[in-house]
Amino acid sequence: FLATAGCHGYAFIETPTTDGFHSKLPSPYTRAVVWGGRPDTVQSASTWLLKKGVLVVDQTKVLQAAADQKVSLTGYQYLETDVLRMAKLVGARLVVFSNAEVGSWEALDWSSGFPHSQRVYSATVALRAVDVNTGEIEWSGKAQSTERFSNIEEGVSLLTCHALATAWGLRNPGAVAPESICPPGSGLMSTEMSPPKAHAAPASSGR
């Protein structure tokens, strides 16, 4: 399939459409594991959460714990219950499961005045935080691109940011959001924004 782009090309990433909710947000220094099949999504979510004061446990520690327990977490055939169990073993309270669905096409870009072929993408990023002890989903967010884009790393990062911002209540669900939430060109949340007040939670929830 060959698509065509007008004057603006595919470089600019439009504000994605989002949905999300939270029942409670993590207290500062909550330990979490970000788990998913795409390293770029995991990295973007980890960076965003670190900026919000969440302590992110590296996936390699979970994989090591799984190897010690002779549990397979590689590929796409793993059980989420095993991930939760291994995350608990390494001291995490939350597992943030990330999922990205990416489609790609060859497109003709006329933005320079001359047609040239390039690969463009559309994507949906979904994340949800699960308590390792109770299995409760504490928050969940999803962001879907509204236009095709050419920079897959920037696109996935921006979608991850908007999905998380919606889950945490920093932007409303839908297709409209302040530019300061996830500034274009950065793909990461603005550091100028003050974090929301975390919901009151039992003292034990931060462990």
Describe the residue ranges of each PLM region.
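Surface-exposed beta-strand edges and their flanking turn/coil or helix-capping segments
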Residues: 47, 69-72, 110-111, 142, ...
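N-terminal post-signal-peptidase region of extra-cytosolic proteins
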Residues: 76-84, 107-116
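C-terminal/domain-edge helix-coil "capping" segments
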Residues: 1-30, 40-41, 86-90, 102-105, ...
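Charged, amphipathic alpha-helical segments
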Residues: 92-113
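N-terminal segment of the mature soluble domain
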Residues: 28-99, 132, 136-140
